[in-house]
Each structure stands twice: as structure tokens, then as C-alpha cells.
């Protein structure tokens, strides 16, 4: 399997779970290694990569910050809700 460049990964950012998993694998880290480097528990990282929807934003940002990213608002292609 050919390794993807970081640029290719960035161009195809999908769910945060897939994004983190792809970057971790690109660096050749195990989940345990990345969790330790980011200062989060292995259980949290596993849940993040599995797409659990009830994770703490601060901890997700702690992992994303390791790669130079953070969560933030993204404009969606739909009509805004009534004010």
C-alpha cells in the first residue's frame, strides 16, 4: 500500500476520526504511542478513531494540536436556520 503524503490527507479531510487515524498511520505510530505523545488516554484515542460522538472538545483538540490542527466552525452548504 502506497503511503499518502500529508498534502493528500489534508485535501481529503473527512470525519475527524478518519483524519486522526490516517495521520497516526502516516507517522507509523501505534495508538498507544500517539496517546502518550498527545497526553491523552489510550481509551480516549481509540474512541476518537472509532468515531464516538460524545467526546470532549478539549481532548479532541489536544490530539489535533499534535498535528497542527484544531476544531472550528466550517461553513456548510445548506440554508441557515431561521433566526
Locations of regions flagged by a protein language model:
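N-terminal flexible/basic segments that precede or flank functional cores
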Residues: 1-15, 75-83
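Recognition helix of helix-turn-helix/homeodomain-like DNA-binding domains
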Residues: 39-53
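Residue-level recognition of specific faces of alpha-helices
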Residues: 12, 19, 44-47
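Alpha-helical transmission elements in cytosolic ATPase-linked domains
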Residues: 3, 50, 59-62
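DNA major-groove recognition helix of helix-turn-helix/homeodomain DNA-binding modules
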Residues: 58-74
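Short basic helix-loop element that most often maps to the first helix and adjoining turn
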Residues: 18-33, 37, 62
Amino acid at each position: 500500500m502506497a503511503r499518502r503524503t500529508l498534502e493528500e490527507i489534508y485535501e481529503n479531510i473527512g470525519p475527524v476520526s478518519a483524519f486522526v487515524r490516517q495521520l497516526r498511520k502516516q507517522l507509523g505510530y501505534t495508538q498507544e504511542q500517539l496517546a502518550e505523545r498527545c497526553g491523552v488516554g489510550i481509551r480516549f484515542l481509540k474512541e476518537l478513531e472509532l468515531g464516538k460522538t460524545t467526546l470532549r472538545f478539549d481532548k479532541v483538540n489536544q490530539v489535533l494540536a499534535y498535528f497542527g490542527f484544531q476544531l472550528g466552525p466550517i461553513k456548510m452548504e445548506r440554508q441557515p436556520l431561521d433566526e
